[in-house]
C-alpha cells in the first residue's frame, strides 16, 4: 500500500544488515525489534548512517535493543525500563512542530512505556508522560 505513495522498504530479521554495504542503498532505517546484541561494527555502520543525515526511526520496543551498547541508548534517546498498558491521551508539547501538523487530540489504548537514561537534548517532539 505504501509503494503507491513512493515509500518502498525491505524487511530484515537479523542485525547483519547493519553494514555500510547494505545501508548505502537506503534513505532510512526503521527499527521495530527486540534484538539483544549489536557488534561494534554494526553500531558504527548504523551511527555513521544516521550522522551522515539518513533517517533512523526506532519504534515501539526498539529502545529495549542492544542494552550492552551505551552509544545506542544515546542514539535512541533513552533505554526501555518497563511498561504497563492503559488508556491515555498523548500530550503534544510542541504543537507548532511540523510533524504534528493536523494532529488532533485523541485517546488510545497501548503499552505505556517507561524509559531510563533519557537524553534531553534534541527532543523537539518528546512527550514525557507522568509516571
Where do the model's predicted regions map?
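Structured segments of extracytoplasmic/periplasmic soluble domains
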Residues: 1-8, 32, 49-52, 75
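A generic local structural motif
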Residues: 15-18, 43-44, 111-113
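Aromatic-Pro/Gly-enriched surface loop or interdomain linker
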Residues: 1-26
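An acidic, glycine-rich "communication" segment
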Residues: 59-131
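Short alpha-beta junction capping motif
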Residues: 23-67
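Conserved beta-strand scaffold positions in the cores of enzyme catalytic domains, especially
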Residues: 9-11, 56, 124-126
